[in-house]
């Protein structure tokens, strides 16, 4: 009798104990993220890779376009450019015994003569008597004759009947550039000393200065 009671009590205690269930096992291939998250991630990676490749391709294209004009220059073109750059200074060179200043070549005579003879000498050299453009050029030519203590002829004479000082190229003297000192009459020509511009007889003897234009298309030739 006592043994049966004990058995019943033990049986009830075991049946009253709650049953523990083990958690369901997860498959290794099962992901806790929704499927559209994975799809968005893959698309984002693909777009990033395409963007990087596009930037690289664009950079290569720009470099190619920049280098193309340089590669198109043939050896003949390069040689021609070198020849032009080498020849340009030679075309601007004045003849021997001539001095260059700005866009002109200047030659100071070593002898004295009348204005007409001086004009003819310059003409024989393919030049003209000096035509003074401005005060700066006047200072330059005075420095050329410094120490000679003599006046020099320029291409300026007094003409009739208009009673004007005119340059040999036909232009009228600008008094802002030169101011003539001395008596002005028929047969007067202009000479320049270290401190003034003189009116004197064209038959007087003076040294003279010839000039040639410096032009890129032609070289001053020795006379």
Curated annotation (Swiss-Prot):
Motif (ITIM motif): 5-10
Single GO BP term: regulation of natural killer cell mediated cytotoxicity
Disulphides: 122-210, 189-202
Tissues and organs where the protein is expressed, per its UniProt entry: Expressed in a subset of natural killer cells.
Recorded coiled-coil stretches: none
Topology Cytoplasmic: residue spans: 1-45
Transmembrane parts of this sequence: 46-66
SUPFAM superfamilies the record matches: C-type lectin-like
PANTHER family to which the protein is assigned, alphabetical: KILLER CELL LECTIN-LIKE RECEPTOR SUBFAMILY B MEMBER 1
Subunit-level organization: Homodimer; disulfide-linked. Interacts with tyrosine kinase LCK. Binds PTPN6/SHP-1 in a phosphorylation-dependent manner.
Domain statement: Contains 1 copy of a cytoplasmic motif that is referred to as the immunoreceptor tyrosine-based inhibitor motif (ITIM). The phosphorylated ITIM motif can bind the SH2 domain of several SH2-containing phosphatases leading to down-regulation of cell activation.
Protein purpose: Receptor for CLEC2D/OCIL. Ligand-binding contributes to inhibition of cytotoxic natural killer (NK) cells. May mediate MHC class I-independent 'missing-self' recognition of allografts, tumor cells and virus-infected cells.
UniProt-recorded name of the protein: Killer cell lectin-like receptor subfamily B member 1B allele C
């Amino acid at each position: 009798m006592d043994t049966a009671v004990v058995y019943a009590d033990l049986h009830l205690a075991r049946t009253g104990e709650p049953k523990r269930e083990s958690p369901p096992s997860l498959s290794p291939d099962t992901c806790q993220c929704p499927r559209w998250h994975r799809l968005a991630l893959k698309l984002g990676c693909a777009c990033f890779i395409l963007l990087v490749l596009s930037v690289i391709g664009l950079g290569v294209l720009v470099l190619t376009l920049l280098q193309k004009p340089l590669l198109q220059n043939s050896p003949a073109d390069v040689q021609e450019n070198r020849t032009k750059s080498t020849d340009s200074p030679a075309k601007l060179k004045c003849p021997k015994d001539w001095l260059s200043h700005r866009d002109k070549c200047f030659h100071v005579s070593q002898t004295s003569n009348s204005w007409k003879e001086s004009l003819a000498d310059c003409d024989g050299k393919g030049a003209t008597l000096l035509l003074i453009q401005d005060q700066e050029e006047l200072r330059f030519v005075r420095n050329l004759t410094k120490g000679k203590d003599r006046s020099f002829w320029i291409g300026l004479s007094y003409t009739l009947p208009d009673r004007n000082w005119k340059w040999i190229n036909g232009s009228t003297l600008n008094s802002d550039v030169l101011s003539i000192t001395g008596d002005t009459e028929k047969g007067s020509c202009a000479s320049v000393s270290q401190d003034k511009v003189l009116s004197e007889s064209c038959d007087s003897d003076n040294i003279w200065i010839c000039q040639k234009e410096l032009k890129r298309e032609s070289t001053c030739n020795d006379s």
